[in-house]
């Protein structure tokens, strides 16, 4: 879960969702999105690659079992928690089960 030279880089929100097969569900110029990760990740465990994004991310955790890593620091994803990160941070996720987790992404514009 540590940043590496092999980390993926997502310049746009569309790039992020294209990487999980949802590129056709979001406009290429999208600057704001909300998704329930339970609708995206249905097979577990799901382990994301380490990636860097050029947009803000808010993760609203209501009910799940998982871990998240930001810049190599790993923590459990606790129910009733909110996580935030700025553009440029390295991150990744490991999900063992997701019932309700919302990812809100937005650009600086």
Locations of the language-model features?
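Short aromatic/basic micro-patch
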Residues: 52, 84, 105
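A short, compositionally biased micro-patch
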Residues: 61-63, 86, 96
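Short beta-strand segments in beta-sandwich/barrel cores
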Residues: 63-69, 82-83, 91
């Amino acid at each position: 879960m540590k940043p590496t030279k092999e980390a993926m880089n997502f310049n746009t929100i569309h790039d992020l969702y294209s990487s999980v097969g949802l590129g056709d569900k979001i406009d290429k110029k999208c600057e704001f999105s909300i998704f329930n990760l339970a609708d995206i990740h249905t097979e577990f465990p799901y382990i994301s690659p380490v990636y860097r994004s050029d947009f803000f991310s808010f993760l609203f955790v209501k009910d799940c079992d998982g871990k998240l890593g930001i810049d190599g620091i790993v923590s459990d994803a606790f129910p009733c928690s909110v996580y935030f990160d700025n553009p440029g941070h390295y991150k990744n996720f490991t999900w063992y089960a997701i019932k309700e987790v919302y990812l809100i992404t937005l650009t600086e514009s």
